[in-house]
UniProtKB/Swiss-Prot annotation:
Its biological purpose: Catalyzes the transfer of the methyl group from monomethylamine to the corrinoid cofactor of MtmC (MtmC1 or MtmC2).
UniProtKB keywords: Methanogenesis, Methyltransferase, Pyrrolysine, Transferase
Pathway(s) this gene product operates in, as recorded in its UniProt entry: One-carbon metabolism; methanogenesis from methylamine
Oligomer and partners: Dimer of homotrimers. Can form a complex with MtmC (MtmC1 or MtmC2).
Effect of T219A: In strain: NIH
Catalytic activity: Co(I)-[methylamine-specific corrinoid protein] + methylamine + H(+) = methyl-Co(III)-[methylamine-specific corrinoid protein] + NH4(+)
InterPro entries: MtmB_MeTrfase, MtmB_sf
Name of the protein: Monomethylamine methyltransferase MtmB1
Family note: Belongs to the monomethylamine methyltransferase family.
Highest taxon above the source species: Archaea
EC numbers on record: 2.1.1.248
Note from the entry: MtmB1 transcript is abundant relative to the mtmB2 transcript.
Length: 458
């Protein structure tokens, strides 16, 4: 039976009030893991250790499993404790009518985001920035300026303000509203000081409530040519605050960036099971959120990193499959274990850049060094490496990419527990001139040399 109209966030809200009742524990501990395991077995999914898939039949099975996961499970609303279900026709309608390209930024600083494919020769868009990492108020502008000064960086992804006027931006307080507005205003001023006043940004990152996110659209702040973030919850869940934010974004004609980081070793389970959920999450982004693009980020439950062997496989297979069977535009976000000014951090980011570029990602978003949890431990140098490696990887044969990745990951994967803490932005850069130290330049050159020895040609 055909659908009455295309599904949107208002339909989601209505169904979230009347859907099947379910406890969150049943959803997290029973429905998600059992269905993911069932679908892995049904379709015989086995990635055989590949980072980027070469078996198109297996990719098709993965797509069917992800589609079926979304169709049969639906999405859990954490506020009403009900399940929102979609029809098969509604899902296909969303897939068949995705936003196939869009522009981020304005003027000469604008960039066109267009579909890429597995092994594409075109370099992906580099969205450089702290990626939600906490940044001190006194260095908020220079930190973001360090990214805008990098020509490899096309757009900025915001950091989190730890304070505004010296006060904590507590959710649903006036300070959260002020921080949400100030965050992007400061970043756009930083871009202008770098000579790139039209750069697009992605945020807001500081605010945690709907009122904070909505207030970021303001004079001097977020505009419709910026990526506006809304986050799904782990796994296949959402709250009604997010649905209200989506309604605002749609009504404002904003570029919508739907974000979610599936957890390897979490509710979904292993590599193939988590990838099934990841594919379902991509599809849900364009259905529930009317997303312009989906920001992925498979993360390891133990190490808190997106750069492990397992999470890179999940990211590579999910993106390649989405790219092969849909026109959904996809990005990935970067959370290395190691901190800035360390070779390990740069090698971790490089492994993910290689994976994302080869698997067809449209946007690379990072780098949140030191797992994105330590204040001021993120700089523009990590984004430079992300961009240079993407440029070197574009067009390389997938078989060669898989060999390089296997060797590269083996260089750092035994060091997660003892990953070097690295240095803060203030220790990595001259804050006044916003230039990296000689020490960081030498570390960077050392990491680059190792990548060249593995076969990358810069």
């Amino acid at each position: 039976m055909t659908f009455r109209k295309s599904f949107d966030c208002y339909d989601f809200y209505d169904r979230a009030k009347v859907g099947e009742k379910c406890t969150q524990d049943d959803w997290d501990l029973m429905k998600i893991p059992m269905k993911a395991m069932e679908l892995k077995q049904k379709y015989g999914l086995d990635f055989k250790g590949e980072f980027i898939p070469t078996d198109k039949d297996m990719m098709e099975k993965l797509f069917k499993a992800g589609f079926e996961m979304l169709l049969e499970c639906g999405i859990y609303c954490t506020d009403t404790h009900r399940i929102v279900k979609y029809t098969e026709d509604e899902i296909w309608d969303a897939i068949n009518n995705v936003q196939k390209e869009f522009v981020l930024g304005t003027g000469r600083d604008a960039v066109n985001v267009r579909k890429r494919s597995v092994g594409d020769k075109a370099k992906p868009i580099v969205q450089g920035g702290p990626t939600g990492s906490p940044i001190s108020e006194d260095v908020f502008m220079p930190v973001h300026m360090s990214y805008a000064l990098e020509k490899e960086v096309d757009t900025i992804v915001n950091g989190v303000m730890t304070s505004v006027r010296g006060k904590s931006p507590i959710p649903k307080s006036p300070y959260e509203v002020l921080a949400a507005k100030t965050e992007t205003r400061l970043i756009k001023n930083a871009c202008a000081m770098a000579g790139r006043p039209g750069m697009g940004v992605o945020g807001p990152e500081t605010s945690l409530s709907a009122q904070g996110n909505i207030s970021a659209d303001c004079t001097g702040g977020m505009t419709c040519t910026d990526s506006h973030e809304v986050s799904q919850l782990n796994e296949l869940k959402i709250d009604l605050d997010a649905i209200s934010v989506i309604a605002h974004y749609k009504g404002n004609s904003d570029i919508i960036m739907d974000e979610q980081m599936p957890i390897f070793g979490g509710y979904a389970g292993g590599i193939e099971e988590t990838t099934i959920v990841d594919v379902a999450t991509h599809i849900n982004a364009v259905l529930m959120s009317s997303a312009s693009w989906h920001l992925d980020g498979p993360v390891h439950i133990r190490w808190g990193s997106t750069n492990t062997r397992e999470t890179l496989m999940i990211a590579g297979w999910a993106c390649a499959t989405i790219s092969e069977f849909t026109d959904i535009l996809s990005g990935n976000q970067y959370y290395p274990c190691a901190g800035p000014c360390t070779e390990m951090c740069l090698l971790e980011a490089s492994a993910q850049s290689i994976t994302d570029t080869a698997s067809g990602r449209e946007i690379l978003s990072g780098v949140a060094s030191a797992k994105g949890v330590v204040t001021d431990k993120t700089t523009g140098m990590e984004a430079r490496m992300m961009g240079e490696v993407a440029r070197a990887t574009a067009g390389v044969e997938i078989s060669e990419v898989n060999v390089i990745l296997d060797k590269l990951v083996s260089l750092y994967e035994k060091n997660y527990a003892s990953a070097p803490a690295g240095k803060t932005f203030q220790e990595c850069y001259d804050v006044k001139t916003v230039t990296p130290t000689e020490e960081y330049m030498q570390v960077y050159d050392g990491a680059r040399k190792k990548l060249e020895d593995l076969g990358l040609v810069f």
